[in-house]
Amino acid sequence: MDRKSFLKTLGMAGVAAVAAPVLMFCRKDDEDEDAVTGIINNSISTACAVTNSETEGPFPTKSPSGLVQTNIVSDRTGVPFTIAITVQNVNANCANLQGAIVDIWHCDKDGNYSEYGGTGMQSTNYASAHFLRGRQTTDANGKVNFTSIFPGWYNGRATHIHVHVYNAAGQSLLVTQIAFPEGNDSAVALVAASTGYKGLSGYTYNSNDNVFSDGTSNEMSAVTGTVSGGFALTHTIKVSV
């Protein structure tokens, strides 16, 4: 099974289950991936409501407790990238949540994940590597920070970051994903055109993405910076504690 088949199968399973919104998808990922077919919407919701739950995908971190680190670059190369995530509690009027455990993971510039590979899902074998994965605990301001490289993309998905949030006791609060702004002057477009990245030919935009096609307003990040100086992502995730 390849990644596109996995996402499609997972989406159907979520619709059938209904009770598992984390698996619900409503668009096929074999739609036109060469152009944006809908209007680009990079708006960010400010509502005090739980962030959408999403699938953890086929490449979740296997032992996140062993990857407590802020610098997740390892041996990967790419445009410098920092990730700042704030976690808020909707049951406390969206006050910043201290002590939440945050796991993140994303693909490298070529669209590959560590800890997996050698299969139809991902041909390149990185089963023994752990790059671009990390865990941090939110501070008094509800924040965690990571140093990484700007992620690439792979067939069937827009650029994204996976996030799993737990309470201080290690109980799961939310599995979600972070979306990236799109457009000609977006970081996604600028990085894709830079040295070492693969461009946007065949790219799946948010409007056609299996996960994001139902809307990205509470999953959309803000990304600033330049290719030469690096980019910085900020994002707020809202959970129920």
What spans do the regions from the language model cover?
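N-terminal secretory signal peptides and thylakoid transit peptides that target proteins
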Residues: M1-G14, D29-D30
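C-terminal region/CTD detector
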Residues: K8-G11, V15, V227-L233
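C-terminal motif of bacterial Sec signal peptides marking the signal peptidase cleavage site
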Residues: M24-F25
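Beta-strand-dominated extracellular/periplasmic modules and repeats
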Residues: A35-G215, T234, K238-V241
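Exposed beta-sheet edge/beta-hairpin loop segments within beta-rich domains
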Residues: P151-Y154, A222-S228
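Low-complexity, intrinsically disordered Gly/Pro/Thr-rich segments
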Residues: F212-G225
